[in-house]
Amino acid sequence: LKLPRSILMVTLSDVDTGAPKAIMSANLLSAMRTGAMPAMSAKYLARKDSRVLSLIGPGVINKCALMCYMEVLPHIEKIKLRGSSVNSRTALAMKEFIEEKYPQVKEIEICSTLREACEDADVVSEAMSVTKENMEEFHLEWLKKGATVFSMGSFLYRQFDDFLGTKMVVDNYGMYEKYMNNFIARGPVDAFGNKREWVI
Protein backbone atom coordinates (compact mmCIF):
# COMPACT_ATOMS: atom_id res chain seq x y z
CA LEU A 1 0.00 0.00 0.00
CA LYS A 2 3.09 2.29 0.23
CA LEU A 3 1.91 3.66 3.58
CA PRO A 4 4.31 5.23 6.08
CA ARG A 5 5.38 3.23 9.14
CA SER A 6 3.02 5.28 11.29
CA ILE A 7 0.00 7.39 10.43
CA LEU A 8 -0.52 10.29 12.81
CA MET A 9 -3.14 13.02 13.03
CA VAL A 10 -3.46 16.38 14.75
CA THR A 11 -6.56 18.45 15.42
CA LEU A 12 -6.36 22.22 15.73
CA SER A 13 -9.26 23.56 17.76
CA ASP A 14 -10.63 27.00 18.49
CA VAL A 15 -9.28 28.04 21.89
CA ASP A 16 -12.60 29.56 22.95
CA THR A 17 -15.18 27.13 21.60
CA GLY A 18 -13.18 23.93 21.18
CA ALA A 19 -14.58 23.61 17.66
CA PRO A 20 -12.13 21.87 15.29
CA LYS A 21 -10.50 24.23 12.80
CA ALA A 22 -8.34 21.62 11.09
CA ILE A 23 -7.78 17.88 11.14
CA MET A 24 -4.59 16.99 9.34
CA SER A 25 -1.65 14.62 9.10
CA ALA A 26 0.92 14.97 11.88
CA ASN A 27 3.60 12.78 10.27
CA LEU A 28 5.88 15.69 9.35
CA LEU A 29 5.33 17.34 12.74
CA SER A 30 6.21 14.08 14.50
CA ALA A 31 9.28 13.52 12.33
CA MET A 32 10.58 17.02 13.01
CA ARG A 33 9.97 16.69 16.74
CA THR A 34 11.62 13.27 16.87
CA GLY A 35 14.58 14.49 14.83
CA ALA A 36 14.99 17.67 16.86
CA MET A 37 15.21 15.92 20.23
CA PRO A 38 18.52 14.09 19.68
CA ALA A 39 20.03 17.16 18.03
CA MET A 40 19.04 19.30 21.00
CA SER A 41 20.65 16.67 23.21
CA ALA A 42 23.74 16.60 20.99
CA LYS A 43 24.20 20.29 21.64
CA TYR A 44 24.85 19.45 25.30
CA LEU A 45 26.06 15.84 25.24
CA ALA A 46 28.14 15.34 22.09
CA ARG A 47 31.73 16.42 21.62
CA LYS A 48 31.90 20.03 20.46
CA ASP A 49 34.49 19.10 17.83
CA SER A 50 32.45 16.20 16.37
CA ARG A 51 33.38 15.71 12.72
CA VAL A 52 31.93 12.32 11.78
CA LEU A 53 28.18 11.70 11.95
CA SER A 54 26.69 8.26 11.34
CA LEU A 55 23.04 7.94 10.35
CA ILE A 56 21.76 4.40 10.93
CA GLY A 57 18.48 4.23 9.05
CA PRO A 58 18.53 7.06 6.48
CA GLY A 59 14.77 7.62 6.37
CA VAL A 60 12.56 10.57 7.26
CA ILE A 61 13.39 10.65 10.99
CA ASN A 62 17.15 10.77 10.46
CA LYS A 63 16.67 13.23 7.60
CA CYS A 64 14.92 15.58 10.03
CA ALA A 65 17.55 14.81 12.67
CA LEU A 66 20.33 15.58 10.17
CA MET A 67 18.94 19.05 9.52
CA CYS A 68 18.98 19.69 13.26
CA TYR A 69 22.39 18.09 13.90
CA MET A 70 23.94 20.34 11.27
CA GLU A 71 22.73 23.37 13.22
CA VAL A 72 24.37 22.32 16.49
CA LEU A 73 27.40 20.37 15.21
CA PRO A 74 28.99 22.84 12.78
CA HIS A 75 32.22 20.86 12.28
CA ILE A 76 30.65 17.77 10.69
CA GLU A 77 32.67 16.97 7.57
CA LYS A 78 31.93 13.28 7.04
CA ILE A 79 28.58 11.48 7.13
CA LYS A 80 28.22 7.71 7.14
CA LEU A 81 24.92 6.13 6.08
CA ARG A 82 23.61 2.64 6.83
CA GLY A 83 20.45 1.58 5.03
CA SER A 84 19.18 -1.89 4.25
CA SER A 85 22.06 -2.32 1.76
CA VAL A 86 24.67 -0.28 -0.11
CA ASN A 87 22.07 0.04 -2.88
CA SER A 88 19.34 1.23 -0.51
CA ARG A 89 17.10 3.80 -2.21
CA THR A 90 16.72 5.77 1.01
CA ALA A 91 20.50 5.85 1.54
CA LEU A 92 21.07 7.03 -2.03
CA ALA A 93 18.34 9.67 -1.65
CA MET A 94 19.89 10.84 1.64
CA LYS A 95 23.31 11.05 -0.03
CA GLU A 96 21.87 13.28 -2.77
CA PHE A 97 20.10 15.43 -0.17
CA ILE A 98 23.34 15.93 1.78
CA GLU A 99 25.32 16.75 -1.36
CA GLU A 100 22.78 19.38 -2.35
CA LYS A 101 22.09 20.95 1.06
CA TYR A 102 25.44 20.61 2.87
CA PRO A 103 28.38 21.29 0.53
CA GLN A 104 30.66 21.64 3.57
CA VAL A 105 30.40 17.86 4.08
CA LYS A 106 33.51 16.55 2.33
CA GLU A 107 32.71 12.85 2.39
CA ILE A 108 29.53 10.75 2.36
CA GLU A 109 29.94 7.00 2.78
CA ILE A 110 27.19 4.42 2.32
CA CYS A 111 28.20 1.54 4.59
CA SER A 112 27.52 -2.15 4.08
CA THR A 113 27.45 -3.11 7.76
CA LEU A 114 26.40 -1.61 11.07
CA ARG A 115 29.96 -1.98 12.32
CA GLU A 116 31.36 -0.03 9.39
CA ALA A 117 28.82 2.73 10.01
CA CYS A 118 29.66 3.04 13.71
CA GLU A 119 33.45 2.88 13.58
CA ASP A 120 35.17 6.27 13.89
CA ALA A 121 31.85 8.13 14.29
CA ASP A 122 31.70 10.92 16.85
CA VAL A 123 27.89 10.83 16.82
CA VAL A 124 25.76 7.79 15.95
CA SER A 125 22.12 8.56 15.20
CA GLU A 126 19.95 5.45 14.98
CA ALA A 127 16.44 5.55 13.55
CA MET A 128 15.93 2.14 11.97
CA SER A 129 12.54 0.75 11.16
CA VAL A 130 13.13 -2.99 10.94
CA THR A 131 11.71 -6.13 12.46
CA LYS A 132 13.45 -7.63 15.48
CA GLU A 133 14.58 -10.58 13.38
CA ASN A 134 16.45 -8.28 10.98
CA MET A 135 18.29 -6.20 13.58
CA GLU A 136 22.06 -6.34 13.49
CA GLU A 137 23.84 -6.89 16.78
CA PHE A 138 25.58 -3.83 18.17
CA HIS A 139 28.98 -4.10 19.89
CA LEU A 140 30.79 -1.75 22.26
CA GLU A 141 34.14 -2.06 20.57
CA TRP A 142 32.78 -0.44 17.41
CA LEU A 143 32.49 2.94 19.14
CA LYS A 144 35.39 5.32 19.49
CA LYS A 145 36.10 6.82 22.89
CA GLY A 146 33.84 9.81 23.52
CA ALA A 147 31.25 8.85 20.91
CA THR A 148 27.61 9.71 21.60
CA VAL A 149 24.76 7.40 20.53
CA PHE A 150 21.20 8.60 19.97
CA SER A 151 18.66 5.80 19.51
CA MET A 152 15.21 6.68 18.18
CA GLY A 153 14.35 3.43 16.45
CA SER A 154 15.02 -0.26 16.73
CA PHE A 155 18.30 -0.88 18.51
CA LEU A 156 17.73 -3.68 20.99
CA TYR A 157 18.19 -1.83 24.25
CA ARG A 158 19.51 -4.87 26.07
CA GLN A 159 22.49 -4.73 23.70
CA PHE A 160 23.50 -1.45 25.36
CA ASP A 161 23.29 -2.92 28.86
CA ASP A 162 26.95 -3.86 29.10
CA PHE A 163 28.49 -0.60 27.97
CA LEU A 164 26.30 2.41 28.49
CA GLY A 165 28.02 2.81 31.81
CA THR A 166 26.30 5.06 34.28
CA LYS A 167 23.90 7.34 32.50
CA MET A 168 21.02 7.29 30.01
CA VAL A 169 19.16 10.47 29.09
CA VAL A 170 15.50 10.39 28.04
CA ASP A 171 13.01 13.15 27.31
CA ASN A 172 9.92 11.46 28.74
CA TYR A 173 10.24 8.77 31.38
CA GLY A 174 6.75 7.37 30.84
CA MET A 175 7.28 7.00 27.12
CA TYR A 176 10.46 4.99 27.61
CA GLU A 177 9.36 3.07 30.68
CA LYS A 178 8.76 -0.18 28.79
CA TYR A 179 12.12 0.10 27.07
CA MET A 180 13.86 0.75 30.38
CA ASN A 181 12.24 -2.30 31.96
CA ASN A 182 14.88 -4.29 30.08
CA PHE A 183 17.49 -2.59 32.28
CA ILE A 184 15.50 -2.42 35.51
CA ALA A 185 14.79 -6.16 35.33
CA ARG A 186 18.55 -6.77 35.32
CA GLY A 187 19.11 -4.84 38.51
CA PRO A 188 20.58 -1.47 39.50
CA VAL A 189 24.09 -2.06 38.10
CA ASP A 190 25.49 -2.85 34.67
CA ALA A 191 27.89 -5.63 33.69
CA PHE A 192 30.85 -3.55 34.89
CA GLY A 193 29.35 -3.01 38.34
CA ASN A 194 28.53 0.63 37.60
CA LYS A 195 25.38 1.98 39.20
CA ARG A 196 22.82 3.02 36.60
CA GLU A 197 21.66 6.60 36.72
CA TRP A 198 18.63 7.85 34.81
CA VAL A 199 18.45 11.50 33.79
CA ILE A 200 15.06 12.88 32.76
Task: Please place each PLM-identified region on the residue numbering.
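NAD(P)-binding Rossmann-fold cofactor-contacting core
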Residues: V72-Y102
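N-terminal ligand-binding/catalytic initiation module
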Residues: L1-R33, M37-A39, A46-D49, I200
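Short acidic-hydrophobic, aromatic-tinged amphipathic segments that line or gate anion-handling sites
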Residues: K106-E116, V169
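Short glycine-/small-residue-rich Rossmann-like dinucleotide-binding loops
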Residues: M128-V130, G153-S154, Y173
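Adenosine-phosphate binding glycine-rich loop
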Residues: D161-I200
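Short, conserved loop/helix-junction motifs that constitute active-site signature segments
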Residues: V72-P74, F138-K145, F160-L164
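Short internal alpha-helix immediately C-terminal to a glycine-rich phosphate-binding loop
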Residues: R33-S54, V60-V72
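Rossmann-fold NAD(P) dinucleotide-binding segment
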Residues: E119-D120, T131-T148
